[in-house]
């Protein structure tokens, strides 16, 4: 055991030899390195696999072991201050190491196929390997200054990968937006680190936690200053994990390659903020005000992310808002003291979201031969549909990932989300109501993504779609065609200016009167001569999907735990995660509310699953196949015919406002642009005017006046008698004028 711990410092450094080798190869033998570029994927996967084996061994030893601090070397600034660099191995570190390495390996394998035709193949592998190294260094750090160093490296790598296709202006703008937004949080994190060093005199976690466990108002520590420093640390996590109000960078980060989106959302950048709060949990739990703030921010974020996801057309952007919402659940769990539930959801969500993002990459790859290599088209769900018969393996894996995120048992996210919902109800009904409602909303927008992508018929060959208008009906009408206010409901068909039928002229007949029917959300297409259809990707891209599917199916079972009451009911007690997920420094004990008996578990599970099924049901009604079972029963049409027109008009207006608000990202970007961007520009213009007009004006004016006076004096003293006589008479005249007056 000690032998393994002795070499644990090697884990973050294992990907570095591959990075250095690729760099030397590009520098000394660039032609050969580029021609043989795909061979570099093997050593990248190999070295990260070695790191994974080390991580698994450490995790097994940590189940019944204790935390290990190991210092490698010390940088002494003076006799009173020194920085000690080392590593900390505890259950939290072990879990994060496994998470990063497993997801990282699968993303690397997937990237070999996804990026095979890209000119930046080698550059991508250098960036992603360094990204993994930075995150591994972050989770093994033993003090705050070491965390900050790797924290900045993670931010730098995300900047490089989000703007990987930097020749595209949108990608360049997106990476700048992510970088600037995270600067706010990183600055707060740095101030918080310096503040706690000033308060406690140490940057080591164990010293901070010992002091935090003992501080009370009588021990001389300023509680207001301590709370402020803790808030600044929390601000860093807010920015990195895309929490409200610093969440605006996350959807734009989808401009990077899809594999890096999977890695960012599953195991690296956005997980760093949750990891920081989990690492400092014994510190935060001693500050009730900060814990309340964490839970409030998490609650706002989980609801906001879900509402913003319901109207997006871009498949990756929809998944990005889903990540934002799920991170809000983790933040809420940490805020209410449910440490185990938060990290459990971090694990289950990581594998499910990696599966969904890699599946979306397969979808995008299959659409590119049809619509071109523009993300505005290849990622647009408006142009998809009916892909289940073209990419069946991707469809199956994507469906299981969707159901997992919806909270359907026995998939991974069901167990963790149900635990968070139960604890939130026990902590506060307010948090419980919002978290439960958002759980149903999650099922709605996730199943919407699935239906728009795989259900119905392929819509890419439709000629009259729009990609410019931003009406709310994008999320209702799959075609992106903004419907005018007055719609003739006697007809299902709609025509364009060119006279081309918007729907197929050969539509199946429906029983009953078609008059006063509402427009359906997808349709059946007639045969159309086409030469290209989506197709399944190669085995290199499918293999990671299948492995992640296994994780999604079975990883949730490690977190099933019941108390002794459950044992009496004959239910086996599985406490692997309970032994594993404990605070890194065991100074606090988790609330007993986190352990529930079988009756409470079944009650909470039934309610959460009912909400999820209701969300799936609503999504299927709105976005399912056009002639589904419910529509053939005239369920929607009978509701419309029996409802008052005023009520239906009001409902339509409310729906329009909601979808418009959601599609425009809650107008947060517009608000930030007008308040901060334009406000700063106006402030700079005012500063420029003050600097050049007033400050420079006074300085230049004094110089100009001095110059003019000097010129006049020079002119007077030029040696001309006429000038002397003229000024003599002028002075005499002025003197006489004042003397006489």
From Swiss-Prot:
| Annotated localization | Plastid, Chloroplast thylakoid membrane
Which superkingdom, per the lineage? Eukaryota
GO biological process annotations for this chain's record?
ATP synthesis coupled electron transport; electron transport coupled proton transport
Q: Which reaction does it catalyse?
A: a plastoquinone + NADH + (n+1) H(+)(in) = a plastoquinol + NAD(+) + n H(+)(out); a plastoquinone + NADPH + (n+1) H(+)(in) = a plastoquinol + NADP(+) + n H(+)(out)
Q: Which UniProt keywords apply?
A: Chloroplast, Membrane, NAD, NADP, Plastid, Plastoquinone, Quinone, Thylakoid, Translocase, Transmembrane, Transmembrane helix, Transport
Instruction: State the membrane topology.
Output: Multi-pass membrane protein
Q: Where is the signal peptide?
A: none
Any stretches that span the bilayer, and where are they? 9-29, 39-59, 89-109, 125-145, 147-167, 185-205, 219-239, 258-278, 280-300, 327-347, 354-374, 396-416, 425-445, 542-562, 605-625, 721-741
Pfam entry (one): Proton_antipo_C
- The protein's Enzyme Commission number: 7.1.1.-
A molecular function GO annotation: NADH dehydrogenase (ubiquinone) activity
User: What GO terms fall under cellular component here?
Assistant: chloroplast thylakoid membrane
Q: Which InterPro entries match?
A: NADH_UbQ_OxRdtase_chlpt_su5_C, NADHpl_OxRdtase_5_subgr, ND/Mrp_TM, NU5C-like, Proton_antipo_N
The record's PANTHER family line, in alphabetical order, gives:
NADH-UBIQUINONE OXIDOREDUCTASE CHAIN 5
Family membership: Belongs to the complex I subunit 5 family.
Tell me, what does this protein do in biology?
NDH shuttles electrons from NAD(P)H:plastoquinone, via FMN and iron-sulfur (Fe-S) centers, to quinones in the photosynthetic chain and possibly in a chloroplast respiratory chain. The immediate electron acceptor for the enzyme in this species is believed to be plastoquinone. Couples the redox reaction to proton translocation, and thus conserves the redox energy in a proton gradient.
Q: Kindly state the subunit structure of this protein.
A: NDH is composed of at least 16 different subunits, 5 of which are encoded in the nucleus.
Provide the protein name.
Answer: NAD(P)H-quinone oxidoreductase subunit 5, chloroplastic
UniProt source species: Lolium perenne
